[in-house]
């Protein structure tokens, strides 16, 4: 069966690795666009693709377009105006992977439908390694028939794939996933930081955490990095602040108090203010350990 031609809009760390994965599997990567032209050109040379100068070029060259942009404003921008992705988009499919507000996903779906195109929101609960290996955890919202049509493609980049309902539900679930993850990360940083201040053996403390109710997935992924101050970026503090903010806005709209999430967002925004926003989220430990820059 012929594989669809694929376009990419937004080829930062995650987008680029998804593109590489699909290229490895023989999908034609037809066109690549990024706000930073050099980023698009570099990946296009690597994959033998067109480095598109405009968004309509991506649409024209591709059957399916993945968008992996940074925030609400970027997502709105690529679907708005006469020279957007929706120019000549009839029959095309957009798979929107960014963590953005659910209302933005819904607006993109409405605009695409009016242009004769289809959309899915494919929210990712994974990081760079999983994107490159094709083992993403994907929560997909959108029309069930469109999901079924694109399921073989989505399976090629994921190890866990589920359809979660309407397009906005994917964004809501992803916001809550990241809300809880960020709270766990900030809480772990406080626990380990307090342990350091109390003069405890942090290796022993971390082992005790792992064997008790203090255990978490974040302890496995970030605990050693917090101790070693190794904060190479897989998921940045700036993105953590953004995503906690999305969840907090949803909570406000629902009339639900989420004080822990607000405190967590404040910690990550403090990192940004201190110039630490591009550290990995584990870098929140720089605010909680004694004798570290942000403590």
Model segments located where?
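NAD(P)+-binding Rossmann beta1-loop-alpha1 motif at the extreme N-terminus of oxidoreductases
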Residues: 1-68, 92-93, 97-98
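Rossmann-fold dinucleotide-binding core
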Residues: 6, 99-178
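Hydrophobic residues within alpha-helices
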Residues: 18-22, 108, 153, 194
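Hydrophobic beta-strand scaffold residues
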Residues: 29, 51, 119-120, 161, ...
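Rossmann-fold NAD(P) dinucleotide-binding segment
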Residues: 55-118
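Active-site-proximal catalytic alpha-helix in oxidoreductases
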Residues: 134, 138-141, 162, 166-198, ...
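Interdomain hinge/lid region at the active-site interface
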Residues: 215-281, 288
